[in-house]
């Protein structure tokens, strides 16, 4: 009986610790973060158009396209495809993406296409592409929007984020918001 009482006390203690105290502590820490843990939003004219850290689908030809998503940009179902480079379905999907890029960008060669433009990230929600991924789209965007190609290229270059660790990236939503403001 003594052991049962000790086990019951331990159970209640861990229940309170992990079901009440720990979540409240994490919630409190999140409230100290920028935007109180609600995510880093991107707004246009006071209206939230998206989140900086979650990719969105852009498939219109007058916008920069982001990295493909294995979950069709559904944040509730964040996941990769779990298909490796030896999977025939995966290889066919990557080839289809390459073919689409080459069709829409006839000035490109297959070797010009960066890998991030044809493969999904582990989360399926990557908001960033490589600078090369953005730069290969400049000619299409300039033509679609009837803008000077140098102006669009300059915009891309101004949106390149240099990290302390890791590769340079371009946030697609931020780039497209800036593109909409470009005249």
Curated annotation (Swiss-Prot):
Spans traversing the lipid bilayer: 10-30
PANTHER family: POTASSIUM-TRANSPORTING ATPASE C CHAIN, POTASSIUM-TRANSPORTING ATPASE KDPC SUBUNIT
Membrane topology: Single-pass membrane protein
GO MF term (any one): ATP binding
Zinc in keyword set: no
Presence of keyword rRNA processing: no
Name of the molecule in the record: Potassium-transporting ATPase KdpC subunit
Gene Ontology CC entries for this record: plasma membrane
Organism: Flavobacterium johnsoniae (strain ATCC 17061 / DSM 2064 / JCM 8514 / BCRC 14874 / CCUG 350202 / NBRC 14942 / NCIMB 11054 / UW101)
Keywords, in A-Z order: ATP-binding, Cell inner membrane, Cell membrane, Ion transport, Membrane, Nucleotide-binding, Potassium, Potassium transport, Transmembrane, Transmembrane helix, Transport
Family, similarity comment: Belongs to the KdpC family.
Oligomer and partners: The system is composed of three essential subunits: KdpA, KdpB and KdpC.
Protein localization: Cell inner membrane
Function: Part of the high-affinity ATP-driven potassium transport (or Kdp) system, which catalyzes the hydrolysis of ATP coupled with the electrogenic transport of potassium into the cytoplasm. This subunit acts as a catalytic chaperone that increases the ATP-binding affinity of the ATP-hydrolyzing subunit KdpB by the formation of a transient KdpB/KdpC/ATP ternary complex.
InterPro entries, per database record: KdpC (IPR003820)
């Amino acid at each position: 009986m003594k052991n049962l009482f000790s086990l019951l006390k331990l159970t209640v203690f861990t229940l309170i610790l992990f079901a009440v105290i720990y979540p409240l502590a994490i919630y409190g820490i999140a409230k100290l973060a920028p935007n109180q843990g609600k995510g880093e939003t991107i707004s246009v004219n006071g209206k939230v158009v998206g989140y900086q850290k979650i990719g969105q689908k852009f498939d219109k030809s007058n916008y920069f396209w982001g990295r493909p998503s294995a979950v069709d940009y559904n944040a509730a179902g964040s996941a990769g495809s779990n298909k490796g480079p030896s999977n025939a379905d995966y290889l066919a999907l990557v080839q289809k993406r390459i073919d689409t890029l080459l069709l829409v960008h006839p000035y490109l060669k297959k070797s010009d296409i960066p890998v991030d433009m044809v493969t999904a990230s582990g989360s399926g929600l990557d908001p960033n592409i490589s600078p090369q991924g953005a730069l290969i789209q400049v000619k299409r965007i300039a033509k679609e929007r009837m803008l000077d190609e140098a102006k669009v290229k300059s915009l891309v270059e101004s949106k390149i984020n240099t990290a302390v660790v890791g590769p340079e990236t371009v946030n697609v939503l931020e780039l497209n918001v800036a593109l909409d403001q470009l005249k």
